[in-house]
UniProtKB/Swiss-Prot annotation:
Organism encoding this protein: Campylobacter hominis (strain ATCC BAA-381 / DSM 21671 / CCUG 45161 / LMG 19568 / NCTC 13146 / CH001A)
Pfam families recorded: GAD (PF02938), tRNA-synt_2 (PF00152), tRNA_anti-codon (PF01336)
Enzyme Commission no: 6.1.1.23
GO CC annotation terms, alphabetical: cytoplasm
Marked site positions, Important for tRNA non-discrimination: 30
Ranges for region Aspartate: 197-200
Highest taxon in the source lineage: Bacteria
Catalysed reaction, written as an equation: tRNA(Asx) + L-aspartate + ATP = L-aspartyl-tRNA(Asx) + AMP + diphosphate
Protein name: Aspartate--tRNA(Asp/Asn) ligase
Amino acid sequence: MRSNYCTELDSGDIGKIVDVCGWVNSYRDHGGVIFIDLRDRSGLIQLVCDPKHSQEAYTIANSVRDEFVLRAHGKIRARGKDLINPKLKTGEIEVVVENLIVENPSKPLPFVIGDKNVSEETRLKYRFLDLRTNENFNKFFTRSKAAIAARNALDRLGFVEVETPILTRATPEGARDYLVPSRVYNGQFYALPQSPQLFKQLLMCSCFDKYFQIARCFRDEDLRADRQPEFTQIDIEMSFCDQKDVMKVGEAVLKDIFKSCGKDIKTPFRVMQYKDAMENYGSDKPDLRFGMKFIDVADIFEKSSNEIFANIAKDKKKNRVKAIKVEGGDLKFSKRQMQRFEEYVRKFGAQGLAFIQVKEEGLKGPLVKFFEKSEIDELVKRCELKVGDVVFFGAGKKKIVLDYMGRFRIFLANELELINPDALEFLWVVDFPMFEQNEDGTYSAMHHPFTMPNNVDEPDIEEITSIAYDVVLNGIELGGGSIRIHKEDIQEKVFKLLKIEPAEQREKFGFLLDALSFGAPPHGGIAIGFDRLMMLVTRSSSIRDVIAFPKTQRAQCLLTKAPSGISNEQLRELGLKINKKEQK
């Protein structure tokens, strides 16, 4: 039916007889000759329907409209010099049509294909139309090449692809599970996996040594621009390895993925401790495409005549005093901008935003009066200030200050256009805390409870670190992993620290504890978020752009209208009764 994709043809094919198929992208009648831009997944080619060559083809062309599906048979010829379109790959040639077939007409469209002003809601409702653009197709072509590259890289490294169950049991992994009622076992439920975590560990206990899977995962959680209820990850696990071994494999896979997309990345990646990332950038996934590293000035503030600042600075365990210097900032920022900066940080818990400006006549700002000259001199030296600079200060509770100053750093970089969109800054963040405190004072595992702790017998739970690592690209977490607990007694200690009693341990994780007791090898792994990776590679604004049929931020599919109700008969079979929630 088809001899070539549209953009496979060029000036080297002049005189060739071809058959091309696709959709009508546009059409126009110029002096009794009809020109059609035919579009397939590769791009566009111009069809010429001239009654001098084929009256029948011309008559059919006169009836076509946008998005009609056509098959055209004809000869390639060169365009006239004044008719060449340099914007098109096929801009030097056209197909003189001898035979034209309408394979299928199209109803009037709800929107023009490729219109950037169409709402996302409409595009998702008619996703099959939205995907017809070459821009969208190319994202999925890139995604396909990346998946193949990942598979080939892992195959080359000796990994075995194994599919783990989709219907499994609920386990506490952080988010809520999607539950599937069992028809056979009334009142019992399967859970869709949040990750293949436990199964891949069991495979290591089964002597598989190296496992991978491009896995589908499900989490019933509140959605953001970079999250979906169902998502894909490149899941990797290996035995007899340490952290460096896993990181080396992760780098090899990412290098091959980017190579398949025409980009070369340098390995090994930079490594940074979690503590340093938080203290210097206010984030466990810092964007290193620009500077503006925090400057710690607590010891200087400790000497301040302002008791509030001094008392904050003295408690170095609970509080932080951080500075961000902007070179030339005093010459760039208006008074209104400075007010806007304060309004921004207040949204994240800041009480205000103190600053000092460096003028020709000296330092200006609300903080200057609270310091002696010697302390001001020390501040100038510490921050390496010069005329025209401005330095911002955040002071208060550790968690709040690091958070809003980290956000403010990114905000400033965007304001100053410091971020190179073409740069690729990879980073490993390591040595995460094993546990984090919840709002109610209890503790949960920062990654998951199967991560190997460095010092499980440390009496202060907040001082226990884990052999965990995240891979970060341009301030976005691509994936994370850890060395796993492979000894039953250590796993039981971690469960105990999480207040999981022995009976509950056996009930929920008995199969894992059994596996660890029968000679489990040291093992570890990593999972790379494939959707998020593709979002970055294709420079998309959301992972919805790189998922063929995504859900909205309300976890709905506007195309199929999922989720949907089921019949009373199905409910009876499952032994379920729906109690509708009251609308708030």
